[in-house]
Design a protein with these regions (language model features):
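Short basic helix-loop element that most often maps to the first helix and adjoining turn
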Residues: 4-23
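Residues that mark the N-terminal boundary/hinge immediately upstream of a DNA-recognition element
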Residues: 5, 16, 42-45, 56
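Helix-turn-helix/winged-helix DNA-binding modules
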Residues: 1, 12, 38-41, 52
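Conserved hydrophobic/aromatic packing and binding residues within compact polymer-binding modules
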Residues: 6, 20-21, 31-34, 60
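DNA major-groove recognition helix of helix-turn-helix
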Residues: 35, 53, 61-64
Length: 71
């Protein structure tokens, strides 16, 4: 399963995979595997990505089109 939304969010933020990997404390290669879907994304990483982008895990994995978290 390709995670298009995490790629779109990264590109919209003008970040390279390497830069986001550094922010998340993982390698560029690991992050690339998450984006392409060649490796599943651990729940801990989904939480970190949702926090970083101020969105929800549901949005990241395509369960909703509502990007904003419920306040």
């Amino acid at each position: 399963m390709k995670f298009q939304r995490i790629q779109d969010l990264r590109v919209d933020s003008d970040l390279s995979q390497r830069q986001l990997g550094e922010i998340l404390h993982i390698s560029q290669r690991s992050y690339s595997h998450y984006e392409t879907g060649s490796r599943g994304i651990p729940i801990e990483m989904l939480i970190r990505l949702a926090d970083y982008y101020d969105t929800t895990i549901d949005y990241l994995v395509g369960l909703t089109d509502n990007k904003a978290p419920v306040k």
